[in-house]
Regions:
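Generic low-complexity, intrinsically disordered sequence content enriched
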Residues: 9, 38, 50, 133, ...
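Hydrophobic-ligand binding "helix-grip"
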Residues: 12-13, 20-23, 27, 36-85, ...
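Short active-site oxyanion
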Residues: 31
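A conserved amphipathic terminal alpha-helix motif
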Residues: 85, 91-140
Length: 140
């Protein structure tokens, strides 16, 4: 599964809300620009990637959502043969607007991606996907 999903640049191939992605590189410092079906654009920078441990970490350098300090991690944890767990987490600060609404928008993005992964790659019995998100308090 890491071969399919572990590339920092692969998100447009499997995430249903991403309509386009531009970027290149798989080393820290690589960037990707995402366009979403609701018209938003995100620019993200890879901060760490470890193929042996099957994870990468990234940060948003530009977003049209009122957020700051966005740091995400995408990890595939190998389980028993032919099983794995995808763990996709993020931390961010909501800078303005309704904190719950903004957090719900990010959560919906993660949820859509997790469901797409499950639909495309899970074999009976269904592989468990975990989604966790922590929203930091708004800056004053």
């Amino acid at each position: 599964m890491w071969r399919e999903l572990g590339s920092f640049q692969s998100i447009a191939r499997w995430h249903p809300m991403v309509t386009g992605a531009e970027g290149e590189g798989e080393e820290p410092g690589a960037t990707r620009t995402l366009a979403t079906r609701d018209g938003l654009r995100w620019v993200e920078r890879l901060t760490e990637r470890d193929a042996a441990q099957r994870f990468y970490r990234y940060e948003a350098t530009s977003s049209e959502l009122p957020i700051a300090d966005f740091h995400g991690e995408f990890r595939i944890r190998q389980g028993r043969p032919h099983r794995c767990t995808v763990i996709w987490t993020a931390q961010f600060t909501v800078t303005s607007g309704d904190e719950k609404s903004v957090s719900d928008n990010v959560r919906a993005f993660f949820r859509a991606g997790a469901r797409a992964i499950e639909k495309q790659y899970a074999a009976p019995p269904v592989t468990v996907l975990r989604r966790r998100m922590r929203t930091l308090t708004r800056r004053r």
